[in-house]
Amino acid sequence: MIKLNEYETSLSERLLISLHNLCATSGEMARRSDDLAQIVQTDVNTVNQCMDKHVSDGYVVSYFDNEGNRRFYLTSRGIIRVCSLFS
């Protein structure tokens, strides 16, 4: 079983887990990239690069809000991916 702490999971996985823990599973609950960067303690560009891969894999949806902030939320496929980390 994977232990879910910062030393045993990749940044990519921590971002998915963070979205899940924040209940970011719809557009209304989407989280800004700068918020995620603060949570995982990295810079916004790194978050955006990781999240671009998750978008292409179908795990995450990305959009820009009215203020120009990039936001992300998990798709159903992303939720399944996060749950698979726990088994």
What are these regions (language model features)?
Residues 1-18:
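Short alpha-helical segments that sit at the start of domains
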Residues 67-74:
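Minor-groove-contacting beta-hairpin "wing" of winged helix-turn-helix DNA-binding domains
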Residues 55-65:
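A short, conserved structural fragment
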Residues 17-24, 86:
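Short, locally clustered residues in the helix-turn-helix/winged-helix DNA-binding domain
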Residues 25-38:
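Short acidic, hydrophobic short linear motifs in intrinsically disordered regions
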Residues 41-56:
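Short amphipathic alpha-helical interaction segments
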Residues 76-87:
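Short, amphipathic alpha-helical interaction segments positioned at domain boundaries
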